[in-house]
Every structure is written in structure tokens, then in C-alpha cells.
């Protein structure tokens, strides 16, 4: 009996402990749910105020007006730095950018986008030399962002009248610059009009009766190099047909090395209006560096070989869907092929340079046929697809310059004999 009694008392003890634990937890929950009233209304009508515990004291709300007032005061603290500083040496005034100034970023957003550039009529020029060349050619400046005042002092003072001068940190210029080593000055100019520009007299003295037509050139580096070659050869004008990369894109400007302000450039020209930009009696020649002509250039039996080169020569992705091979062969303009080193400068000439991706357009061949022009062959060795567009343009332009120089020398020699 002792053992069962002992087991019964142990079970009863454990049960009591469980009941006590549950009762303790219940009391804790009840204590947590109890709330002390803030005010007590007695039957007599008296109100008794109860004091809150320290942890129950209400927090003071921060008034919104004070935070707004602090926000409104922040620009006022930086307003003294917006006061224009006077440049006493030339009587010009410049602004010093204040923290959070967005004038530079807003302008850069416009001039670095082609649609915005064309809509706003503004371009970006970077570097002291390029800016000086633009001012010398008659470009109209709108604003200059610079990190040191000495950079502005190097520019012609008479060209800086009514121009916004804003001094910014060099880090801000570096963030927006396309150069590896920024020069600390950026200029915003109105998009130049070739009719109103005053180009340097020395290049004009050596100008040739030679016009360059760029057809669907899309690589900025190639176009900048071509413009540089055109300025060096002495072209009278450069026409960029619709579809070419913008001549005023920063990469083209960087590759051009100032050629934009040494030769007139007409941008975004429709093929229907190209003859309006050419001198009277101009013959249009098309650059042809297709290797298939290297062996048949002087032969009269071009036939199928002409067509083999034409398929790579033209951008037929727009036309070949609805035409079979025979129809296209009859439809193509018939142009005579001539070696580039033979005389082709007897009359005013225009040279068409096509892009490397699609070649020249059908419109260029039709214009060449209507003006009595030819294909100028640059022979390359078998296995080589073609030359770089900038290289082909340089070869033809300087060959034309050589031929014209020989004509001038022969003419002066004949006059000396008489």
C-alpha cells in the first residue's frame, strides 16, 4: 500500500504545479490587460486626475512646420554663393555654381541627345582649342562652364559679351566630359549655320572645286576622320545625307579635331535636294573599292561581274524582296568604271562615300548616272573585302587634289611660255 500511496501523492503534486502555473499565467495576462483610467468621475461630480507612470507619459509630437521651415532655410543658406562675381579686368560677370546647382546637368542632357540638339539648336564644344576655333569661325556662344577663370581669360573678350559664364567644380566637368583628360571648360553654342560662318582665309584660298557627299555613314569615328580629311584636302563643302550620324555629336567633334570650323558642313540633306547644293555642271562620282573590279576595270565585259559587285555595292535590303535577279540587273543604273588615278577632275566634281555596313544608296547611283559620273575604282588585293570608309575618302580626295594641282601647274607653265 505504501508504494501506490506514494505514486498517488506524486501525481497529485505534479497536477497542482500545473494548475498553479496556469493560474499564474492567467493572472499575468489579466494584469497586462488592465488599464488605469486617466480621469475618475465620482458620484458627487468631482473629477479626479490620475498621474501616469513614467513609461506612459505621452511623447511630444514634432511640429511639421518646424521641419518645413528648416527645409526652406537650406537654399537661403547657400544663396550668398549665387551672387555674381565681378571680373574686373574685362568687365564681365560670372556666376559661381552653388551646391545642388543643376544648370550644368540640365544643359548636358540636352546637348548630348540628338533629338534635343535638333530641337533646341544647341551643341557642346569641349576644350580650349576647339572653342577658340569655333569663336574664330563665327559660332555664337550661349554659355561657358569652367573650373578656373584663367581658361576663360584665354578666349577673345569681345566674343564673350552677353554670354553666361558659370564657374563649377572640376569634378562636375569630369563627370560630364567625354574626354579622357578634361580641360576644365565646356562651351554651349548655337548650332552653326554654314551660310553665316566665316571660315579661315587660308583654307578658303586653297579651296578646290570638289564636294564630298557622305551617304549613310553611321560610325562617329569614321565621319570625324572623313571631315578632317575633307578639310585637309580643301573640299569646298561636305554634304551629309539623311541617315548619317550627326556631325555635331561629341564623338564626331572629337575625331574631327576642329575640321567642323574649317569646311562648310550641311547636315541631314535629302537626296532630292542634293543637286541644289552642288555647283552647276557638277559630275557625281561614286567611290568603289570592291575587289571584284581589280581585274576587270579596263574590260568592256563587265556584265555578271558588275552585278556580283553591285549586290555588295548597294544597300538592297530595301528593294530585293520584290525583285528577282534579272529585274534588278536591268533596273540598276549603268555606270562606267574608272580607276581612281585617272583624270576625273576636268569639271567640278562630287565624290560619294558610302557606309561600310550597307554601301552606297541607289539614289547616289542614279544621281551619278544623271550627271555623267562614274565609279572610281580603288583596287584591292583578292581576298580583301573593302577599305575603311575614311581611308577610301582620304585616297580619293587627295587624288583629286593632286590632279587639280597638276592642272594648275600646267596652266601656269603654258602662260609663262606665251
Swiss-Prot record:
Keyword rRNA processing set for record: yes
Biased composition (Basic and acidic residues): 47-58
Signal peptide: none
Disordered: region residues: 41-90
Transit peptide residues according to the UniProt entry: 1-40
Catalytic activity: guanosine(1370) in 16S rRNA + S-adenosyl-L-methionine = 2'-O-methylguanosine(1370) in 16S rRNA + S-adenosyl-L-homocysteine + H(+)
Principal location listed in the UniProt entry: mitochondrion
InterPro entries: Alpha/beta_knot_MTases, MRM3-like_sub_bind, Ribosomal_eL30-like_sf, rRNA_Methyltransferase, SpoU_MeTrfase, SpoU_subst-bd, tRNA_m1G_MTases_N
Annotated compartments: Mitochondrion
Positions of S-adenosyl-L-methionine binding: 354, 378, 387
Family assignment from sequence similarity: Belongs to the class IV-like SAM-binding methyltransferase superfamily. RNA methyltransferase TrmH family.
Enzyme nomenclature, EC number: 2.1.1.-
Protein name in the entry: rRNA methyltransferase 3, mitochondrial
Reported function: S-adenosyl-L-methionine-dependent 2'-O-ribose methyltransferase that catalyzes the formation of 2'-O-methylguanosine at position 1370 (Gm1370) in the 16S mitochondrial large subunit ribosomal RNA (mtLSU rRNA), a conserved modification in the peptidyl transferase domain of the mtLSU rRNA. Also required for formation of 2'-O-methyluridine at position 1369 (Um1369) mediated by MRM2.
Recorded GO MF terms: identical protein binding; RNA binding; rRNA (guanosine-2'-O-)-methyltransferase activity
Pfam families named among the record's database cross-references: MRM3-like_sub_bind, SpoU_methylase
Polar residues bias (residue ranges): 65-85
Gene that this polypeptide is encoded by: Mrm3
GO CC annotations on file: mitochondrial matrix; mitochondrion
Protein keywords: Methyltransferase, Mitochondrion, rRNA processing, S-adenosyl-L-methionine, Transferase, Transit peptide
Keyword Methyltransferase: yes
Amino acid at each position: 500500500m505504501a508504494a501506490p500511496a506514494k505514486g498517488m501523492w506524486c501525481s497529485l503534486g505534479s497536477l497542482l504545479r500545473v494548475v498553479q502555473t496556469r493560474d499564474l499565467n492567467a493572472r499575468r495576462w489579466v494584469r497586462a490587460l488592465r488599464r488605469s483610467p486617466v480621469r475618475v468621475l465620482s458620484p458627487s461630480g468631482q473629477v479626479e486626475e490620475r498621474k501616469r507612470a513614467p513609461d506612459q507619459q505621452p511623447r511630444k509630437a514634432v511640429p511639421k512646420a518646424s521641419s518645413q521651415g528648416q527645409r526652406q532655410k537650406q537654399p537661403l543658406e547657400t544663396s550668398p554663393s549665387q551672387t555674381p562675381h565681378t571680373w574686373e579686368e574685362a568687365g564681365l560677370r560670372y556666376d559661381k555654381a552653388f551646391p545642388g546647382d543643376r544648370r550644368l546637368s540640365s544643359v548636358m542632357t540636352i546637348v548630348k541627345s540628338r533629338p534635343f540638339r535638333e530641337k533646341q539648336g544647341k551643341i557642346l564644344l569641349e576644350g580650349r582649342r576647339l572653342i577658340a576655333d569655333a569663336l574664330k569661325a563665327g559660332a555664337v556662344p550661349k554659355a561657358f562652364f569652367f573650373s578656373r577663370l584663367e581658361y576663360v581669360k584665354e578666349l577673345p573678350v569681345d566674343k564673350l559679351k552677353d554670354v553666361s559664364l558659370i564657374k563649377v567644380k572640376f569634378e562636375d566637368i569630369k563627370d560630364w566630359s567625354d574626354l579622357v583628360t578634361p580641360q576644365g571648360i565646356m562651351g554651349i553654342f548655337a548650332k552653326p549655320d554654314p551660310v553665316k560662318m566665316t571660315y579661315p582665309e587660308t583654307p578658303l584660298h586653297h579651296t578646290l572645286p570638289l564636294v564630298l557627299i557622305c551617304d549613310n555613314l553611321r560610325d562617329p569615328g569614321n565621319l570625324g576622320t572623313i571631315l578632317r580629311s575633307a578639310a585637309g584636302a580643301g573640299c569646298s563643302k561636305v554634304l551629309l545625307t539623311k541617315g548619317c550620324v550627326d556631325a555635331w555629336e561629341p564623338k564626331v567633334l572629337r575625331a574631327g579635331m576642329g575640321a567642323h570650323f574649317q569646311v562648310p558642313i550641311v547636315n541631314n540633306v535629302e537626296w532630292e535636294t542634293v543637286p541644289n547644293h552642288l555647283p552647276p555642271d557638277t559630275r557625281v562620282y561614286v567611290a568603289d573599292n570592291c575587289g571584284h573590279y581589280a581585274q576587270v576595270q579596263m574590260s568592256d565585259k563587265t556584265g555578271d561581274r558588275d552585278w556580283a559587285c553591285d549586290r555588295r555595292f548597294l544597300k538592297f535590303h530595301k528593294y530585293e524582296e520584290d525583285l528577282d535577279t534579272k529585274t534588278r540587273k536591268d533596273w540598276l543604273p549603268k555606270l562606267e568604271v574608272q580607276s581612281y588615278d585617272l583624270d576625273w577632275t576636268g569639271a567640278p566634281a562630287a565624290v560619294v562615300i558610302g557606309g561600310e555596313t550597307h554601301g552606297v544608296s541607289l539614289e547616289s547611283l542614279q544621281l551619278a548616272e544623271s550627271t555623267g559620273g562614274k565609279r572610281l575604282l580603288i583596287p584591292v588585293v583578292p581576298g580583301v573585302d573593302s577599305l575603311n570608309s575614311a581611308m577610301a575618302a582620304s585616297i580619293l580626295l587627295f587624288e583629286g587634289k593632286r590632279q587639280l594641282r597638276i592642272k594648275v601647274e600646267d596652266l601656269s607653265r603654258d602662260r609663262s611660255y606665251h
